[in-house]
């Protein structure tokens, strides 16, 4: 895993390179496809822990305040080399007007190929934020094709639970999203599975888009003239010349 850069310069980030402490290195190779994922949600729901767990398999309980870092990792899924870039984002509050004016959040959502919305089962306010974030992401991607996944984190803290898992599943179904309940601290496999399925979906979309562009770029060949028609027209022209010569 590599920390690429702070989110404040995300719009300047080139797809095939990264910047780490002033040095440049490749974030993808010529044979790697770039997949960009934005992870969003309320404060303290475990967004950074989720990202680091997926990219490194390690769980770190304490983090500094989220500055909105962009991470990269090379993986292979179904035989395809992927350069996965994951944009961690600072926590947001329940206020649609604040979402619209949150430039950091907007940059991340516009940049992303897919969105992961994280909430904590121990925080009902973070659950209430899901619909706002989902609507905002759809507005920034009016084509409605961007995949959005909802992740319920801290599944191990049952004694602090404020949100029932079935409520998260019901909301995800209503919004047309995939739902995962995970414990970032205790289960890496669930975290990996959520991102793996998402990456497969993005890759499939990219393949479909490439095929459509290739299909649309094919210029249809003009129809070949009918040889019988050409012979008929040639005979007509020849007969006309013969009649003209005879009359003279």
Swiss-Prot record:
Signal peptide: none annotated. This is Ras-like protein family member 11B. NCBIfam families: small_GTP. PANTHER family: RAS-LIKE FAMILY MEMBER 11. It is an enzyme of class 3 (hydrolase). One of its GO terms (molecular function) is G protein activity. Transmembrane segments: none annotated. Keywords: GTP-binding, Hydrolase, Nucleotide-binding. The keyword GTP-binding applies. It comes from Xenopus laevis (African clawed frog). Residues 206-228 are annotated as: Disordered. The lineage of its organism: Eukaryota, Metazoa, Chordata, Craniata, Vertebrata. The keyword Ribonucleoprotein does not apply. InterPro entries: P-loop_NTPase, Ras-related_GTPase, Small_GTP-bd, Small_GTPase. Its EC number is 3.6.5.2. It catalyses: GTP + H2O = GDP + phosphate + H(+). Belongs to the small GTPase superfamily. Ras family. GTP binds at residues 41-48, 88-99, 153-156. The gene is rasl11b. Residues 30-248 are annotated as: Small GTPase-like. Gene3D superfamilies: P-loop containing nucleotide triphosphate hydrolases. Disulfide bonds: none annotated.
